[in-house]
Amino acid sequence: MLVLEKAAACGGTTALAEGAVQASGTQWQKEIAGVTDDSAELHKKFWLTDAEGIVKEDLVECMAKNAPDNLKWMADSFNITFSNVFGCYPTPYMKDEYMRDRIHLITDASDETKTGGVVWTTNAQKAVEEKGGEIQTNTEVTDIYQDETGTVVGVAAGKKNYKANKGVVFAMASIDHNEEMSFRYDQQQYWDLKTQFVATAETNTGDGIRIGMAHGADSAFHGAVDLILQTWSYTNNQNPEIPYILIDQRGNRFVREDTTYAFHCRAMFNAAMAQGGIDGCTYMLMDSKMTTADAKCAWSDNAKDGAKAREAALADGSMVQADTLEGLAEKLGMSGTNLKATVDAWNAACAAGEDAAYGRKVQLTALDTAPYYAWKTQNTNIGSIGGLIIDTDARILDVDGNPIPHLYGGGVNTAGWLGPYYPGSGTCLQGALNWGRIAGASAAASK
């Protein structure tokens, strides 16, 4: 086996990630989280619900069914264990019965102080090389070769061509840093590139997708994987959450805030576009309780250099502060009457213990203590959603739905299994595991 890696080192965005992988019914889920009533069927229904009808059910079913065995294979093959299991937050239409703690944190089995995606990429590279696999870094694949039957027989990489005896597997990430492709196919990703912050590996430019489409492969693009990094809001159910509401440029709430992070970030994108186009924005509205919030809030006095970060945000204008809501609204260029009405309604909901407007359940905490703060939200993008359509054998399909012979796809340069927003941490790494493993097996079995 030959691995051609574009970057100077292997790992990509996976090596930068926290190392979360979703699965149901594992030994770790039972032992660590105490969850004994989960199943692949419930996991499938969870993923399908958040997909909003724009995934291929057979792909989602394949992932959910294989997920527990994929984790066991990962542990057995790469000296990995899982030191924590936690859950994600729901969406407004998610049924409680589909929710379970399924997110497994990757940990080195020999040294449990080592966690994260880098453990997997490091240990996997070692295992590949020990089994005789060859890895070439700083080698960018620029095209594929097909014979007269359309079968993929090799790749071009710089001045060299490589023959593929069994097939080619694309595992080349999505269009995260490709502004041209984002402009064409993924408005939310384009907005993130132009106005927000994209934190993925710089080499993620959708090379496999571009090459595949040039050779007739089908594709689908939907949105982005966004989160609010400054507060880690609703990224997992073990994190403490800070009191705030999200408001648009008119001072209105527009989403249930305690939803899984990519869901409310998609709503932030839509609200910004609806009122300001590409220059639009939303705000996180807080009161003085923010300054004493948990250390995961970047501006809290409890965070490392939190007070300095707050001062810097106030100095650069990304955050504004006022002693009254009307004064805050004036600084934001919105109606003070409307902003006060929004906060009054929120505080009344907190007093009643019910958010009748949006159904929020977590941190029903009044915003009633001056000074008040509004932070112009910034999404941190950890990946785009879009790629080449595959089948359950990880074969890349052409626009007529037929497999392109000897061309396979793994990870997030494939599509059909992720919907319009990210359904919670650990989905992408399970996708990398599942489709990469299947793609390798399919290529090995090809004739």
Where on the chain are the PLM-derived regions?
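N-terminal glycine-rich dinucleotide-binding loop that anchors FAD/FMN and/or NAD(P) in oxidoreductases
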Residues: L16-K45, L339
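Core beta-strand elements of the Rossmann-like FAD/NAD(P) dinucleotide-binding domain
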Residues: Q136, G158-G167, N402-I404
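Conserved redox-cofactor binding core of oxidoreductases
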Residues: C62-K159, E179-E180, C350-T369
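An anion/pyrophosphate-binding glycine-rich loop and adjacent beta-alpha core
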Residues: I209-I211, H215-M334
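A glycine-rich dinucleotide-binding beta-alpha-beta segment and adjacent secondary-structure elements
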Residues: D143, N338-Y421
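Glycine-rich FAD pyrophosphate-binding loop
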Residues: M1-L16
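Rossmann-like flavin
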Residues: T36-D96, V320-N338
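Glycine-rich loop(s) and the adjacent beta-strand/alpha-helix scaffold that form part
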Residues: K163-Q230, I438
